[in-house]
Amino acid sequence: MTPKAKPRKQSVILVTIVALALALLLLRMFVFVHGQGRRGIRRTQSGQPAALSTVHAASYGTAASWARQPWSDRFGDGTPDFLRLTDPADQAAFRQWFTLIAEYQAIRPKAEIPTEITDCASLLRYSYREALKRHDDTWFVATGIELVAMPGDVRAWRYPETPLGAALFRIKPGAFEPEDATNGAFAQFADAKTLVERNAYLVTRDVRQAQPGDLLFYRQFGQSSPWHSMIVMRIAGQPAVVYDTGEDHGKSGELRRVLLPELLDHPQPQWRPIPGNPNFLGVYRWNILRGTL
């Protein structure tokens, strides 16, 4: 090979590579323009994507996806079936977020506790609502919550992207009817009595069967605010509860974490979660965790 032949061959190779690159670029532009950038998705006769699972579609909160959900009330408890978390993974995610959020309020500096948390019912409302949101960077900045390990999010739906909007809690009696989505049957606020009667159901009066995320309810007769609640959780693997004491004689309450054995041995018998205590209503569970479809 002569000294001039080698550079000439390299030039030919370079030109060939450039030509191939341009050809590939033109081909991709042609496919994009004529295909309009669409992905191939099989659709039903109604025009809705058939490839998306119900859970995945529901997470987008579109009118079409919610129309495919069951607007029924299998248990007649006032909660629509489209809100029930039927996937065990979703149930576990909700329980983890619900208890983590509630417990965090009890260990953070008092000045950082959200101002809306003033009693036991408000702790339930706040933790329930926040557990069902999307937990992205914006959420962490807004709540000031810091976690070492983050659970997965609920996938079925997220607050407030449902037909109920921001109105999360059932406040009217009766089974769910489709018109309840807009007639005031649901609201953003519900007191402890309404939470236990309209948004949760009795599981047992044996506290040993309670799971993290379950609720303990009491009715202390003779008090101006007789309904009280606690959230079942774990402290270092041991059963425990977290709750807000609420205002007492003009003095603001405080958030407490108590191991279950200590609660069972409470110096005031009316607070012991035992079947023989008439003030203890039992272990309750949120309606959205009730049964499977």
Model region roles, listed by residue range:
Residues 32-51, 57:
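Ser/Thr/Pro/Gly-rich low-complexity linker/stalk segments immediately outside membranes or between
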Residues 9, 35, 44-47, 176, ...:
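Intrinsically disordered, low-complexity regions enriched in polar/acidic and amide residues
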Residues 1-9:
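N-terminal Lys/Arg-rich, disordered targeting/topogenic segments
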Residues 240-293:
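Low-complexity, Gly/Ser/Thr/Pro-rich intrinsically disordered linker/tail segments
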Residues 14-29:
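Hydrophobic membrane-insertion alpha-helices, especially the h-region
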Residues 49-186:
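N-terminal capping segments
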Residues 148-251:
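...with weaker cross-activation on analogous glycine-rich loops/strands in unrelated enzymes
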